[in-house]
Amino acid sequence: MSKIKHFLKIFLFLISLQNINSQEVINDNSIEFFRKSFQDNLPKPYNWTNDYENLFSDEEETKLNKIIDDFEKETSIEIAIVTIDSFKVSKENFDMLSLHIANSWGVGKKDKSNGILIAISKGHRQIRIQNGDGIVQLFSDQETLMIIQKSIIPFFKKDEYFEGTLSGLMNIIDLLRTKQK
């Protein structure tokens, strides 16, 4: 009788392990389905700054939007900022999604390809700046990388996401102003 009880305990234990493993598969599949759905049905941008990760206060978003709006009126260059929650994209697909967002939203004037998208994921600890072809003629990928490394990341390391974003934005604007003259 004790052998049957022992066997029954082992059997129930194995079934519970199977249930745990299948739950992980369901969760992984659900997350991937959600991510694919987000990518296929991107929300329309509601302003220059689209904070889907809730990194900025309303006042901070307003300030970023005003700076970008004033710069766009001055130069016709469009800059969009998007923060992306880690549930909406895997770390491996972050760069691809940021390019997809830039293209889908049509950041920049179509005839000038003069758009810039700053994509941020606090959850994945990633940032990507996508420059349109017209912007690439004004400043290089190396200059973009320097802005990320020197103006943005030092603030992000201190969890100062608004300050880092603002610093990077102002450096991009300053660089573009000097290059356009």
What are these model-predicted stretches?
Residues S2-K9, Q18-L117, K122-K181:
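A structural boundary signal for the start of the first folded domain, especially the loop/turn
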